[in-house]
Amino acid sequence: MCFIFIPADLEIGKVVASLVYAPTVVGITGNYDDVNRLCSEIAGVYPWAFANINLRPFYAEGSKTLCFEILEQLGWQAPDHLILPAAGGSLVTKAKKSLKEFHLLGLIDKPKTKIHVAQAAGCGPIVTTLKEGGDFVKPVKPDTIAKSLAIGNPADGIYA
């Protein structure tokens, strides 16, 4: 049996692919942070796994493929700049990791890529921390129509 907890107002296009496994979909009033908090509580009570994308190594490692594609398209040259959207921060951390790994494998020269983080104006805890030079990311209440970026308490934010 599979349960998928989602924000109740999530776009149907983000849900459809999951329906192929015939899960029980539970809409939660609130944003991704509210859903994550509830799932953490449920996993603490029941013997259920909480497979959040920020906690799954396969998702995180899969994020590196973005840079692999970019490097291939640029003839195995690292770009000067990358502008990446950030929700939980994993894409940013894995972009850095993938460039380093390609260099360690001898497939590219040492990258001098500058990575720029983009977040929605109403939900920018990582960008705010970077601008302020903070040591940790302060959670915010998301206020944006960009639901995929509406993570007010980003799991990998401090590493981005």
Language model regions located:
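Buried hydrophobic positions in well-ordered alpha/beta secondary-structure cores of metabolic enzymes
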Residues: 18, 70, 82-83, 115, ...
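Beta-strand segments within the central parallel beta-sheet cores of soluble alpha/beta enzyme folds
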Residues: 5-6, 80-85, 110-119
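Active-site-proximal loop->helix
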Residues: 1-41, 127-131
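Active-site/ligand-binding loops adjacent to catalytic centers
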Residues: 30-47, 101-160
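Active-site/ligand-binding-proximal alpha/beta "capping" segment
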Residues: 41-106
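Hydrophobic beta-strand scaffold residues
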Residues: 2, 25, 49-50, 150
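Generic beta-sheet signal
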Residues: 5, 28, 51-53, 118-120
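Short glycine/serine/threonine-rich phosphate/pyrophosphate-binding segments
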Residues: 1-3, 11-15, 60, 85-95, ...
